């Protein structure tokens, strides 16, 4: 999992990327391409 400052640009890299908030953190998850995974921090 990558840790990035801004997830907005990462979200546009694949059409199945989802922006999710969990426990006060923002994540990018992708069910079809598992390699697109990131956390904002």
Swiss-Prot record:
- Family designation: Belongs to the bacterial ribosomal protein bL36 family.
Q: Which GO terms describe its cellular component?
A: ribonucleoprotein complex; ribosome
Alphabetized, the UniProt keywords read: Ribonucleoprotein, Ribosomal protein
**What is a GO molecular function of this protein?**
structural constituent of ribosome
Q: Which gene encodes it?
A: rpmJ
Which Pfam families does the record cross-reference, listed alphabetically? Ribosomal_L36
- What processes does the entry annotate via GO biological process terms? translation
SUPFAM superfamilies in alphabetical order: Ribosomal protein L36
- Can you name this protein? Large ribosomal subunit protein bL36
Q: Which HAMAP family match?
A: Ribosomal_bL36
């Amino acid at each position: 999992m990558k840790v990035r400052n801004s997830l907005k640009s990462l979200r546009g890299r694949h059409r199945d990327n989802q922006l999710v908030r969990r426990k006060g953190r923002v994540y990018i998850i992708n069910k079809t391409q598992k390699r697109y995974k990131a956390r904002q921090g």
